Amino acid sequence: MLEDYYPSTTSYYHGGIDDDLYTAKWGMVMTFLDLNDSSLTPFEGTHFALIGFKSDKGVYINNGRVGAVESPAAIRTQLAKFPWHLGNQVMVYDVGNIDGPNRSLEQLQNSLSKAIKRMCDLNLKPIVLGGGHETAYGHYLGLRQSLSPSDDLAVINMDAHFDLRPYDQTGPNSGTGFRQMFDDAVADKRLFKYFVLGIQEHNNNLFLFDFVAKSKGIQFLTGQDIYQMGHQKICRAIDRFLEGQERVYLTIDMDCFSVGAAPGVSAIQSLGVDPNLAVLVLQHIAASGKLVGFDVVEVSPPHDIDNHTANLAATFIFYLVQIMAQHS
């Protein structure tokens, strides 16, 4: 039995029910699935599993604005309203949440990793609704556990921050996940392939820039680079990064976008990547056929305005699933 795991029992769609797939919405199509069901066997074809990670413990430790614990429900509510375009050949299963208010951050990350591995064993592509960006390490661990030690797994992070902070004194938090991935790779004598899109210089100290400069395998584009380059040059840079790689894990921190587009985040951003450009870049990553799982993190509903941020996060999920279904 999976620890800290609670299957879904609540529908987030409250509109009319229509049996016609031409007019169906996500909330009408999504089906509940219990990962603890021992009778389940691997699914055939391309299907997705949606799981919430109800934790912002890492945000609290990192002195951010707490509230991301509420985001899985907020994102589900927005996603449920969107039209369904994929017919009956693709399924999105809502498998529930990882939740443990009295559990440690490390325990919850471990529980998420076990749930992710279970999804992968069932041939379901994981979609994780964070939660703080501590979500990423649990997601990454689960993906790695589903692979052999020699298998590659590149990481693309759309984020204003590197999240490569040391954690030897403070312990893990929402800003250390990718350093933990890096350290795991070093321990396993693997190259950590990591590409960050949207870095803001005023959000990252010189230690982090120096660490990146000395670390083979880590690349980044600043928000200003992205503004100047346009999506075609960005996509070519991503292609170069993914050359020779078979798998990529994608994580989207909603603080990559300005407060005008994403007011409800743990750490607000004055500057930020244009969401329309982001959609084009995300679609390109999905079209590579290498995307094995993704998450959206750091939505903080108590700080949101008219669900702008939750809706934007749901929009990214919509477009990623559309393209992944066509190229997996």
Swiss-Prot record:
Q: Which reaction does it catalyse?
A: N-formimidoyl-L-glutamate + H2O = formamide + L-glutamate
What's the domain of life for this entry? Bacteria
The family database entries (Pfam families) matched by this protein are listed as:
Arginase
Q: In which pathway does it act?
A: Amino-acid degradation; L-histidine degradation into L-glutamate; L-glutamate from N-formimidoyl-L-glutamate (hydrolase route): step 1/1
Q: Biological process GO annotation list?
A: L-histidine catabolic process to glutamate and formamide; L-histidine catabolic process to glutamate and formate; putrescine biosynthetic process from arginine, via agmatine
Please explain the role this protein plays, according to its UniProt record. Catalyzes the conversion of N-formimidoyl-L-glutamate to L-glutamate and formamide.
Q: What is this protein called?
A: Formimidoylglutamase
Q: Which organism is it from?
A: Streptococcus pyogenes serotype M6 (strain ATCC BAA-946 / MGAS10394)
* Phylogenetic lineage: Bacteria, Bacillati, Bacillota, Bacilli, Lactobacillales
